[in-house]
Design a protein with these regions (language model features):
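Secretory/extracellular carbohydrate-interaction modules
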Residues: 2, 9-102, 194
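Flexible glycan-contacting loops in extracellular carbohydrate-active proteins
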Residues: 152-186
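Surface-exposed loop/edge segments in extracytoplasmic proteins
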Residues: 85-89, 110-113, 148-154
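Extracellular beta-strand elements of beta-rich domains used
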Residues: 126, 188-192
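Short, aromatic/His-centered strand-loop micro-motif at the edge of beta-sheets
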Residues: 104-127
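Short tryptophan-centered beta-strand motifs in secreted/extracellular beta-sheet-rich domains
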Residues: 61, 122-134, 141-143
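Surface-exposed coil/turn segments at beta-strand junctions on protein surfaces, enriched
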Residues: 52-54, 69, 118-121, 161-163, ...
């Protein structure tokens, strides 16, 4: 990952991500701890008073695809951990697979049936809305790609994590293709809104 990239960039401060190698379908996950342990935003929430109040999330980002023919999967995640409970709202654009948006559940990835049509050699914009429901279920609400919104409205259970895990992270992942071709993407204006 290279930060502070001025071109291509919408803000003048994008991040460059690259994948390659020799093992087909390998992936690389980049994670930013926003709240809680290791917070990069100065929000350690040491008293554990902020996380319990958060139930809604909007992940919003611009991303540049340099070569869609090599872009197997791009993944966008919101993760929350507290009280031994792990909550992951993982969304992947399975571009060279089923061509749809997939979401992660306990048994693995499932297709939403919503097409993920990437703009090649261009900026794309994604907005993901998710919610922690009152019963502790993870609600995948909507995915908006390049101005087209799809309602997902599917709920799934959380999972168990070590009691020491505490915080909210955002992640971005690139998956390699069948040849593990070198591929580069850029992310700009990434934000997480929560309440």
């Amino acid at each position: 990952m290279i930060q502070g990239v001025s071109s291509p960039s919408l803000s003048g401060n994008a991040a460059q991500f690259q994948i390659g190698g020799t093992t087909p379908y390998s992936d690389v996950l980049w994670t930013n701890p926003v709240i809680g342990q290791f917070s990069t935003q100065g929000l350690p929430d040491d008293a554990h008073t902020l996380l319990p109040t958060i139930h809604n999330f909007i992940y919003d980002a611009d991303f540049f695809v340099t070569d869609a023919s090599k872009t197997q999967v791009l993944e966008f995640d919101i993760n929350m951990y507290m009280n031994s409970v792990g909550m992951t709202w993982a969304h992947q654009c399975n571009h060279l697979g089923d061509g749809d948006w997939d979401i992660a559940v306990m048994s693995g990835w499932i297709s939403t049936g919503v097409p993920c049509n990437l703009l090649d050699n261009s900026w794309n914009h994604v907005t993901i809305q998710a919610q922690l429901e009152s019963d502790g279920s993870l609600l995948f609400q909507t995915i908006t790609l390049n101005g087209v919104t799809a309602n997902i409205n599917q709920s799934y259970p959380a999972y168990t994590v070590p009691a020491s895990w505490y915080g909210i992270t955002v992640s971005y992942q690139m998956d390699g293709d069948s040849e593990q071709a070198t591929n580069t993407t850029y992310v700009d204006n990434l934000s997480l809104t929560y309440w």
